Amino acid sequence: MGIPEENSLVYDWTEQGPRRARWPGHVMLDDETLRDGLQSPSVTDPPIDTKLQILHLMESLGIETADVGLPGAGERQREALLQLCREIAQHHMRIRANCAARTLMVDIRPIAEATQLTGVPIEACLFIGSSPIRQYAEEWELDDVLRHSREAITFALREGLEVMYVTEDTVRSSPDQLRILLKAAVEAGAKRVCLCDTCGAAAPDAVYNLVTWVGALLCEIGSPQVGIDWHGHRDRGLDLANTMVAIEAGASRVHGTALGIGERVGNTPIEQILVNLKLLGIRNDDLTRLPEYVQLVSQVTRVPIPVNAPIVGHDAFRTATGVHAAAVIKAHKKGHTWLADRIYSGVPAGWIGRSQKIEIGPMSGNSNVQHYLASHGVPVTPELTKRIMDEAKKSPRVLTDGEILEIVRGFSP
C-alpha cells in the first residue's frame, strides 16, 4: 500500500451535510484568569511576581488581551493592576490590557489613573446587568440602567480609555431591552460590546441566535465595525460548545481562563479554546508552553488539574489499553509521527510538547509490554513479556515504572 495523503486519512464531517460551520479567518482571545479566574471561591490569589509570570506566559501563547483586574474590589487589586501595566510597558509586551469595572466612576477612575501612570492603554470593560431577572432583584428600571451606562461610557472616554460595554446576563435579556442598551452604548462611543452567559444558562442554539442577532443590529444602526465579544460560564457544561458557536455566529473575540477557573464552577478553559481554534485552522499559535502555563496557574491558585482534563490532564495522552496501544505502535513502526499522534487522539500531543504514552495494565496486550521494554532499553523476550503480562492481569490498575522494573530485575528465564 502506498503512503496516503494525511488529509485523506481523517474524514471531516464539519465540511459535509446540511449544517456546515462558517468559521472566520481569525478570532482574538481575552484571558480572564487574573480577574474572573480569581473570583472562584476556592482559589488562592497569587502574589504579584507570579501574576507577572502568568502574564508573560499568556503572551507566549499568542493571547491578545489580558483582563488585569477589578480595581473597584480594593487596594490589592488596584496595586496589581499598576504592576501588571508597568510590566507591559517595561518589556514592550504585545499583549493588551483590559480591566473590568462597574458602570460607576469610582470603578473607572483607577483604570484611568493606571493608564496615566504607566502609559499603557487599557480597555475599560464596563458591565451592568441587562436581564429582567437581575433588574427585578436590584429594583432597577431600564431608564436607570440606560443612564448609568451612558454616563459611565462618557466618563471613561473623557478619561482617555477605550470602552467595551458589557451586558451581564445577556443570554436572558430580551431583544427589546438589548436593542435600547446596545444602541445607546455604541452611540456613546463603545468600540466593542460583550455578550455574557453570566450564569452559564444558555445552550448553543441560544448563543448562535443571540450573537447573530447582535451582529445584525450593529449593521442596522450603521456600526458594523463594533466588535462582538463572547464571555461564557460552564454551569451546564456547555461552555466550550457555546464559545465555538459564538465564534461561528460572528464573535471576533472570546474569553476564557486557565483550567476554566472562575466564578462558581468557572469559565471556558482557555487551553481548550486555543487547541480547538488551532485544529480548525483559525489560529496557529505555538502551544508548547501551554502545559507550563496551566501548571503554574494550578500551582499558585491551588486548584488541582483533574487527571482527565482535556489537553493538560495527566491522562490526556496515556493509554494502557491493548487495542489502542497496538495501533499507536504500528504507526510508530511505519515511521509516521503524524499518524501515531492522531490514531487514537483527537488532539496531537506534540502540539503542546507532550507525547503519546503507552503503559501496562490489566487491559493491556503483549504489544504494550514489548513497546515499554524496548523504549526503556530492556531486551524483549517472550518469557519476560509473559511474566509482566501475568502480573498486569492480576493488578487492579496500571503498573508503575517501579513495579515493572522490579519484575524485570527479579526475572530469571
Spans of features found by a protein language model:
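Short, small-residue-enriched loops and turns at beta-alpha junctions
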Residues: 36, 40-41, 72-75, 131-134, ...
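A mid-to-C-terminal "edge-of-domain" accessory segment
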Residues: 2-35, 283-413
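Conserved active-site and cofactor/substrate-binding residues in soluble primary-metabolism enzymes
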Residues: 46-49, 53, 75-79, 106, ...
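N-terminal capping/small domains of soluble enzymes
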Residues: 1-103, 360, 364, 370, ...
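Alpha/beta enzyme core
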Residues: 2-4, 23, 29, 45-64, ...
